């Protein structure tokens, strides 16, 4: 039985929100290159791929601090050093994504969901400036109507603010929404928003099995959400889902747009 059949009683959700790193793409090799470049410039021993794999998932500033501490616990890292390290890291990571790859089954699943008219959003803790170029390189951007970066809003996952914002934009209640991620912060954000969370077992969760976070379901291939699993021609009973038109297919939620939303809400509250 597919994930959708188990979680939504034979229907599709109206909205699916995805994490990026560790869920749709394996970006650790390029992140590790940038981290090691930063450490080398600061005269510190390089970390290596596996250490970086255990540190990712909470955004670039936290990743840099963990690398400087050589530990998940980064409380003792000097703020000035962290700022310097972050600047070097951001410069190094912006250069290219030579080693990042899309996980097996991701493109097929996104194509199928798009074909079925499901609204999709991307909510990542990756800094906004890196998201669009990476999606372009991986040829994934066209699938998402809403894209929210880690510094787009004042809060990032595990805070559920981005999930609430996207659900509001999509007109989708929590009962018809799904979050797909790979880490503790993803599961916590989904639970805080009242949304079911499907977790990928192959992602980044600081070396801990994601099942320990008690998501609604754990899968090892995104295609297992689909009825018939690997059958891309499968059909399923749909709730009343409106297929988005091509001209309104993508809305990148930038910091500038978010501030406009905040101001509009403030005006509405004042008038009320």
Curated annotation (Swiss-Prot):
GO terms for cellular component: cytosol. It comes from the Bacteria. The lineage of its organism: Bacteria, Pseudomonadati, Pseudomonadota, Gammaproteobacteria, Pseudomonadales. Signal peptide: none annotated. Its cofactor is Mg(2+). Pathway: Organic acid metabolism; glycolate biosynthesis; glycolate from 2-phosphoglycolate: step 1/1. Specifically catalyzes the dephosphorylation of 2-phosphoglycolate. Is involved in the dissimilation of the intracellular 2-phosphoglycolate formed during the DNA repair of 3'-phosphoglycolate ends, a major class of DNA lesions induced by oxidative stress. HAMAP family: GPH_hydrolase_bact (MF_00495). It catalyses: 2-phosphoglycolate + H2O = glycolate + phosphate. The keyword Magnesium applies. Keywords: Carbohydrate metabolism, Hydrolase, Magnesium, Metal-binding. It is an enzyme of class 3 (hydrolase). The active site is at 19 (nucleophile). This is Phosphoglycolate phosphatase. GO terms for molecular function: metal ion binding; phosphoglycolate phosphatase activity. Its EC number is 3.1.3.18. Belongs to the HAD-like hydrolase superfamily. CbbY/CbbZ/Gph/YieH family. GO terms for biological process: carbohydrate metabolic process; DNA repair; glycolate biosynthetic process. Mg(2+) binds at residues 19, 21, 182.
